[in-house]
């Protein structure tokens, strides 16, 4: 081969290499070799989508920071200079405890929503502690109209029949601080010898923390609380590190200097005082168990012991979200509703419409309850009525990518509680659409003809979470394309524990060297104001029965034929079902309007609950949460029965401000505006796998609202997400199967916002 030929070949090789390099560079970005980027997915809904927000959409919106500020300014002017900031208030002070939305009367709200009447006055409800009056009391004041208040109306007598006794008031944060100061500065030094020996006691107990129990006493009028002491484990759950010491603090007096320790409990024995405990310890009469203050092998921490792995799965919206959130109003192609938070009762939704038709006026959490057992006084007496602490008040910021999908829409919540200025919980709600990874319906046919039809289950979810001391509750409202609404709550967080001593098998399981996981029940109560094709509804119960019969074509043989039983429930007592009693498998509210097939249009209440036994009715405090006895009760709706519980029930369950059982007074429920009251709950016997945290798996309960002859067929039949193809069609063609278009329709990268967290203090 001559040199000329070699030169030509070299030139051709160089040209080929250059061409290949150019091809490679075309496929790479112009930033020095990074791979080309997919376009970002749209971050907003396409403008052509049909859903819109009606002008009256903010009727149920929680109060804004500006409204809260205006109410507080007005109350300060009207109540005078003696008003103290609740953040620093002592029991003998006057202070504004809370301000929140006063919900409008239903008749006025519907007149506005449905008939265009002027909106009802926007009002606030304030709870005020009057500790400086000759007869200290608690008052409820309605303030309006907002945003420029001009009147204040005391509704305490109207709603409760008289002034609210002062001992029923919730415990302020300042009161807890004063109790801690009393315990650590005045009381614990009296037992410093024992505490040094057992618990690595430091000056004024700085390595220890207290945890409250409730209710506070044994009879109406008491205000005496058992406090457990725990190691203060930084960055982890102290709830698992009980040191075995519990103190009964009487804090009824208006002057904290007069508060006393009524009883002491230490590792299985009772004492009259810490001084007595110390004296017996010095005399060698106390059996002391030395408890390490560094946890048990780190299993108490939520920090993973392994490094991060590959990124987990991520759902995104390839063509932008298919819903919108404006203020408190959510709208999608199927659903519209308003959402909010009661400061004490927690999450609630209003004016729920499916394809434009109202199904529900209100679904709201009313109360949550945890009843404990154990062989220590704190464990055996604890009945946490969480509304007394505040399921809205203790709502927490939602952590993007853990508490909700990373790309969910996050909404803040403004509140005014124990403060003179409003605060904000960032990311208190999340709203998202989610593919459940499950078909809502489907059929694959190989019989006579060949076809497939189905619809992926895609739901719209609004979520919030509350952390009540050790437990975290997840509150979900799920909207399904079939017209069903699902209400679900989950429990997670840390278990409440007790110091391990004596015969503990009756009260739970040992979960670490010195820790008993104490048995308890969880229950939550919900108000469901269904308006099924109008305000006039009836309650129907349907079930099944096997009826013996002779076989028609062979009379000598017997057959058990399955039949449907139907019964109209006409009185409240008929529609009140106790926990553990037989409940109709189908119970639904129906209108006097029929569907195409002649059946009354109805919505079924389907419960998913495995509640523990309710507190026996002969208990002195059972009236304080009498709703717990009923898995379901349907009553006439009344404005004077807005809630099944009260923020004041926690501290006086013996003479409760609201007794739900009074709602069930055997009035007619035929053709009336009705409310269904639903209880969901479960028994929790803590076990080793509850360490470090209880998991949500298997610890979620709730109920469904499902259409029952409300439509003429399944409304999801009309879903644009439906898939259908025959055996003689090309299922890989876009015009046949929309899923075949995904490689093009979803060829985008989700626009992930930078991670942020709402923080650990509210601003």
Swiss-Prot record:
UniProt effect for mutating residue 394 to N: Increased activity towards 2-phenylethylamine, and decreased activity towards methylamine and benzylamine
Residues modified by glycosylation: 43, 137, 212, 232, 294, 592, 618, 666, 679
An individual GO BP term: amine metabolic process
Induction and repression of expression: Up-regulated during in vitro adipocyte differentiation.
Active site: 386, 471
Bilayer disposition of the protein: Single-pass type II membrane protein
Expression across tissues: Strongly expressed on the high endothelial venules of peripheral lymph nodes and on hepatic endothelia. Also highly expressed in appendix, lung and small intestine. Expressed also in adipose tissue, in bone marrow, colon, heart, kidney, ovary, pancreas, placenta, prostate, skeletal muscle, spleen and testis. Isoform 2 seems to be the predominant transcript in fetal kidneys, fetal cartilage and fetal tonsils. The highest relative expression of isoform 2 occurs in skeletal muscle, heart, pancreas, kidney, and lung.
Cofactor(s) the protein needs: Cu(2+); Ca(2+); L-topaquinone
Cofactor remark: Binds 1 copper ion per subunit.
Extracellular side: 27-763
Coiled coil: none
EC primary class: oxidoreductase
Binding-site residues, Ca(2+) 2: 572, 641, 663, 665, 667
Annotated residues for binding of Ca(2+) 1: 529-531, 673-674
Disulphide bridges: 198-199, 404-430, 734-741
Regions of this protein lying in the Cytoplasmic compartment: 1-5
Residues involved in Cu(2+) binding: 520, 522, 684
Miscellaneous notes: Dubious isoform lacking the transmembrane domain and active sites and is therefore most probably catalytically inactive.
Biological role: Catalyzes the oxidative deamination of primary amines to the corresponding aldehydes with the concomitant production of hydrogen peroxide and ammonia. Has a preference for the primary monoamines methylamine and benzylamine. Could also act on 2-phenylethylamine but much less efficiently. At endothelial cells surface can also function as a cell adhesion protein that participates in lymphocyte extravasation and recirculation by mediating the binding of lymphocytes to peripheral lymph node vascular endothelial cells in an L-selectin-independent fashion.
Name of the molecule in the record: Amine oxidase [copper-containing] 3
Organism: Homo sapiens (Human)
Gene encoding the protein: AOC3
């Amino acid at each position: 081969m001559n040199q000329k030929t070699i030169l030509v070949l070299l030139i051709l090789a160089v040209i080929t290499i250059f061409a290949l390099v150019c091809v490679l560079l075309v496929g790479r970005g112009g930033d020095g070799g990074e791979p080309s980027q997919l376009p970002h997915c749209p971050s907003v809904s396409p403008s052509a989508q049909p859903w819109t927000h009606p002008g009256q959409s903010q009727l149920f919106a929680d109060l804004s920071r500006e409204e809260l500020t205006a109410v507080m300014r007005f109350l300060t002017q009207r109540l005078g200079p003696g008003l103290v900031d609740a953040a620093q208030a002592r029991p003998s002070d006057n202070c504004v405890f809370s301000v929140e939305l006063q919900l409008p009367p239903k008749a006025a709200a519907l007149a506005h929503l449905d008939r265009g009447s002027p909106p009802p006055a926007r009002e606030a409800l304030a709870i005020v502690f009057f500790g400086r009056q000759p007869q200290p009391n608690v008052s409820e004041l309605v303030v309006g109209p907002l945003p420029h208040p001009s009147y204040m109306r005391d509704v305490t007598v109207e709603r409760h029949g008289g002034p609210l006794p002062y001992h029923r008031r919730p415990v302020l944060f300042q009161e807890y601080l004063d109790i801690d100061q009393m315990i650590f500065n005045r009381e614990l030094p009296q037992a410093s010898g024992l505490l040094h020996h057992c618990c690595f006691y430091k000056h004024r107990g700085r390595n220890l923390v207290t945890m409250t129990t409730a209710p506070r006493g044994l009879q109406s009028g008491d205000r005496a609380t058992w406090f457990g002491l725990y190691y203060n484990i930084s960055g982890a759950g102290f709830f698992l590190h009980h040191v075995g010491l519990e103190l009964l603090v009487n804090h009824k007096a208006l002057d904290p200097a007069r508060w006393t320790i009524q009883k002491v409990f230490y590792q299985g024995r009772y004492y009259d005082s810490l001084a007595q405990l110390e004296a017996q310890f010095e005399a060698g009469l106390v059996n002391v168990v030395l408890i390490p203050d560094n946890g048990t092998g780190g299993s108490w921490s939520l920090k993973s012991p392994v490094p991060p792995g590959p990124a987990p799965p991520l759902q995104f919206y390839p063509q932008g979200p298919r819903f919108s959130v404006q203020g408190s109003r959510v709208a999608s192609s199927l659903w519209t509703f308003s959402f909010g938070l009661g400061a004490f009762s927690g999450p609630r939704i209003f004016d729920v419409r499916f394809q434009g038709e109202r199904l529900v006026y209100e679904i709201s959490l009313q109360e949550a309850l945890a009843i404990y057992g154990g062989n220590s006084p704190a464990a055996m007496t604890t009945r946490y009525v969480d509304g007394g602490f505040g399921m809205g008040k203790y709502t927490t910021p939602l952590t993007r990518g853990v508490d909700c999908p990373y790309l969910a829409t996050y909404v803040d919540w403004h509140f005014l509680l124990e403060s003179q200025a409003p605060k904000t919980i960032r990311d208190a709600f999340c709203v998202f659409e989610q593919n459940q990874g499950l078909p809502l319906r489907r059929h694959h046919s190989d019989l006579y003809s060949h076809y497939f039809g189905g619809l992926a289950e895609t739901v719209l979810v609004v979520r919030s979470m509350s952390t009540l001391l050790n437990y975290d509750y997840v509150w979900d409202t799920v909207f399904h394309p079939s017209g069903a609404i699902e209400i679900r709550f989950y429990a997670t967080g840390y278990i409440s524990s007790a110091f391990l001593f004596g015969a503990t098998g009756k009260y739970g399981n040992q979960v670490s060297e010195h820790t008993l996981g104490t048995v308890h029940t969880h229950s939550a109560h919900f108000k469901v104001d269904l308006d099924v094709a109008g305000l006039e509804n009836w309650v129907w119960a349907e079930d099944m029965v096997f009826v013996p019969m002779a076989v028609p074509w062979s009379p000598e043989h017997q057959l058990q034929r399955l039949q449907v039983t139907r019964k109209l429930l006409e009185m409240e007592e008929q529609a009140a079902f106790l926990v553990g009693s037989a409940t109709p498998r189908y119970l639904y509210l129906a209108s006097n309007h029929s569907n195409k097939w002649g059946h009354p249009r109805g919505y079924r209440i389907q419960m998913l609950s495995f509640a523990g036994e309710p507190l026996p009715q002969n208990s002195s405090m059972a009236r304080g949460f009498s709703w717990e006895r009923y898995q379901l009760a349907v009553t006439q709706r009344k404005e004077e029965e807005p809630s099944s519980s009260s923020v004041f029930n926690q501290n006086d369950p013996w003479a409760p401000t609201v007794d739900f059982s009074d709602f069930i007074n055997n009035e007619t429920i035929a053709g009336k505006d009705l409310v269904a009251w639903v209880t969901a709950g479960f028994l929790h016997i803590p076990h080793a796998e509850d360490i470090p945290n209880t998991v949500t798996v298997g610890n979620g309960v709730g109920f469904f609202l499902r259409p029952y002859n409300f439509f003429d067929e399944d409304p999801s039949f009309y879903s644009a997400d439906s898939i259908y193809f025959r055996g003689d069609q090309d299922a890989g063609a876009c015009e046949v199967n929309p899923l075949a278009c995904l490689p093009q329709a979803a060829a985008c990268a989700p626009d992930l916002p930078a991670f942020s967290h709402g923080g650990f203090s509210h601003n």
